[in-house]
Every structure is written in C-alpha cells, then in structure tokens.
C-alpha cells in the first residue's frame, strides 16, 4: 500500500504549483499542465517519488543514521519543529546559520557556549553578577537557543537532510551538496530538482501540503527507528517493488484538475504564501 493516497494529496493541495511565469523549466517532467496560469504538479509522480524518499529515509535511520529537518519560512517553521520533535529528529526552523554543516565544529562551540550559560544560570551564578551583565548574558543565551535549540544534541553531521523550500534554503542545499549529504525535499514548480537527491514534486507553500509531506518523512524516521530496535535486515530501496498507481487514483487526479475552476482566483504569489 502506498505511503500516501491520491485523496490525501488532493485534499492538501499538493498539486498546486506557482504561477506559470515563475516556473523552473527543469521541473517540466513533473508538471501535469497549466490551469488559470498556475502550474499543476503531476501527483501520479509525487506518489511514486514520495514512496522512494520514504523508504530511503527509513533505511538510513534503520542503519543508525540521523536526519536533520530544515524549514525556516513562517508557514513551515512550526510544522518542522512539531514533526521533528514527534520523531526525535534534529531541526532548524529559525535561521540557517552559514557554515552550520561545512563549519560544524564552530557551531558546536556555540552550542557549548549556550550550555555553559545555562549551567551558570542553574548554579545561581547569575544571582551574584551585576544586573547589566546578567541582562546581556540572558540576551545572548536566548539568541543562541533560538538558533541552535533544535540541534543542541547533534554531535555529528546528519546522514540525510529534509528540506522545505530549496529555493529559500539554498545555503543549506549548497552545504549539504558540498559534503555529500543526501537531500530529500519538496520540489515546487519554481525549484531546481537537479540539486535534490530524492525529489518529491509538490506544493512547498501551503501549510496543509507542508504538513502532509513532512509528517510522512517523520513517519519514515519512526519506522526506521523501530526497524533498528528490532534488528530488521535492511532491504535497499532500489530492490523494493515500485509502487503502482491505480486507475482509480489516476481518474481521481484528472477529475480534480478538471474541477479546478473554483481555484481560478488562487494566487500562490500573494502575501498569503509569503
């Protein structure tokens, strides 16, 4: 049974891309067509490619790997935190600090500095320091928490990275590629899928779409951990039988596209999606 159903994808609006004028031609293989000036993403391909991504993530985790969730735009940040915490993954949902991966040891020093400040507060050292100095230390501590709280226990580089909006998170993409860390990501119609190792064609702006796809990756992490604990033999993703799209699901998708008149006024480039 597929990881996700056509009905789930349609209800979450995963098929809505950006306006035609904003597309990246490299996404052409994943575009079904255009409706009212908006690219429609081919969900038949989304189902198959999400399946591959899901099993890849599960395999990595089952073999003892770790994953980092990344998404800093406002409609993604809360979802990234919630789903990462649900599956026990590391996450970045505020601002990507340049060098977070490529200069990881320096980042670790900043995290150690945060831990030192927290110990000072717990041990009552702040109580005997001048108020002005304490204010400055607390301000510094909060800034470090905001930046690094989701990775404070990450002792080494992640083995895979999940990204929502590779255009916005281009620095994270660049660093991961430089280090050879596999990228699993949503590819909206304005993205370059060639920088992604496991592409999931879909809407990376709508909250429901982000939630659905991120939750599936979190589910893959949980499954991988369960397999690791049960010492299940890992079957490489490439050896799995590919998922097949049923005729019923194909028809459901085509009907939904044809009925998209009611979305004629939808403008993904409006402030609703900023």
Swiss-Prot record:
It comes from the Bacteria. GO terms for molecular function: structural constituent of ribosome. GO terms for biological process: translation. PROSITE patterns: RIBOSOMAL_S2_1. The keyword DNA-binding does not apply. Pfam families: Ribosomal_S2 (PF00318). Transmembrane segments: none annotated. SUPFAM superfamilies: Ribosomal protein S2. One of its GO terms (cellular component) is cytosolic small ribosomal subunit. Gene3D superfamilies: Glucose-6-phosphate isomerase like protein, domain 1, Helix hairpin bin. Keywords: Ribonucleoprotein, Ribosomal protein. Belongs to the universal ribosomal protein uS2 family. NCBIfam families: rpsB_bact (TIGR01011). This is Small ribosomal subunit protein uS2.
């Amino acid at each position: 049974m597929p990881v996700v159903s056509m009905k789930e994808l349609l209800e979450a609006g995963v098929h809505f891309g950006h306006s035609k004028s904003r597309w990246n031609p490299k996404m052409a293989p994943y575009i079904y067509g255009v409706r009212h000036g908006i690219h429609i993403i081919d969900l038949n391909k989304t189902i198959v490619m999400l399946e591959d991504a899901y099993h890849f993530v599960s395999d990595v985790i089952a073999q003892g790997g770790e994953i980092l969730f990344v998404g800093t735009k406002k409609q993604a940040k809360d979802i990234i935190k919630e789903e990462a915490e649900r599956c026990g993954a590391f996450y970045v949902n505020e601002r990507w600090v340049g060098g977070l991966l490529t200069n990881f040891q320096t980042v670790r020093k900043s995290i150690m500095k945060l831990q030192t400040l927290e110990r000072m507060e717990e041990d009552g050292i702040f109580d005997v320091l001048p108020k002005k100095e304490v204010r400055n230390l607390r301000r510094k501590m909060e800034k470090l928490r905001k930046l690094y709280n989701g990775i404070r226990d990450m002792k080494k580089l992640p083995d895979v990275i999940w990204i929502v909006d590779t255009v916005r998170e281009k620095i994270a993409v660049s660093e991961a590629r430089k280090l050879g860390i596999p990228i699993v990501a949503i590819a909206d119609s304005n993205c370059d899928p060639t920088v992604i190792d496991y592409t999931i064609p879909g809407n990376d702006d709508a909250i429901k779409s982000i939630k659905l796809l991120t939750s599936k990756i979190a589910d893959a992490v949980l499954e991988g951990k369960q397999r690791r604990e049960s010492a299940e033999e890992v079957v490489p993703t490439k050896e799995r039988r590919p998922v097949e799209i049923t005729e019923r699901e194909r028809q459901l998708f085509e009907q939904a596209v044809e009925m998209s008149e009611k979305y004629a006024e939808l403008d993904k480039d409006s402030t609703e999606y900023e």
